[in-house]
Amino acid sequence: GKEAFSCTSDHGDLLIHVPHLSRTLRILSPGMPVNILGVEFEDDEKRTAEMVIIAPDYLIDVSALSACMKPYGDSAESYFLDMISPKETTIPIMLGNAANRFMDDLVNTPVDFNDNEAVNQLYEESLHKHFMENLLNYSCLDLPLDKSYFDTLKETFRNIKSSVQHRFPSAEVGLPLEDTLLEPSFICETLGLRGRLDVMAANHKSLVELKSGKAEENYGHLQGPQRQHVMQMSLYKEMLHYNFSMPRDNVKSFLFYSRYPVFYN
């Protein structure tokens, strides 16, 4: 089968061998813009590439791309199915919105974490903001809210508060609050990706992605992070690598599952 394609670049006409990307070769058509990454010059005639990014100007969202990895299998068609599927408002989605609000307020609000009264006041204010921001969404829920939901909200706040207070500034994570950025957005023309991280150090060397849902479990026992979440974090690291020439090993990344709470590196 076909193992190479020709292209015009700043270095003239090139013949690129990519035998490991046969599916990509079937998609290519004349005049299609591509980014060619990881090119190796084996000799004057033969060049190989690690990756070929098709139509990089069409920026794909990292979260949407990672969501193509389903528990029942992986498929690129899932991207289009998710785009046309009706958007539902569910309790897990609202819990995720609340977790993001708690994270924002705990990082940005000057508060003595050892002062229980001040922390409780912050929780009430943060919860009030969350409900005011999501009044319409809550009115569209199919299921009524009960006491267990509010218990979960309070537990989520406590878990995030404890992690922001103790885990973030630790040497392991490396996120002192004074140098922490919330929800920075990036585009990466090289990879054709766009995305918004949850938490990042100002020096780009530490990332935390907040997850309010479940990690991988087996009969109630934690097994590790979900595959699609690992892919999401890996793509964020690749964006930093190509945008800022950051060595991959210099970026620490963590998936923070607030319901447990647990950090996965």
Which residue ranges define each predicted feature?
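Mg2+/Mn2+-dependent nuclease catalytic core
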Residues: C7-P30, V34, L175-N265
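Extended, charge-rich, solvent-exposed interface segments
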Residues: R47-L95, R101
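A residue-level signal for conserved active-site and pocket-lining positions in enzyme catalytic cores
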Residues: P71, A99-N100, V199, Y236
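Hydrophobic (often cysteine-bearing) scaffold residues that line and stabilize catalytic clefts
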Residues: I91, L95, Y149, Q228-Q232
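A non-catalytic, helix-rich entry segment at domain boundaries
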Residues: F102-L182
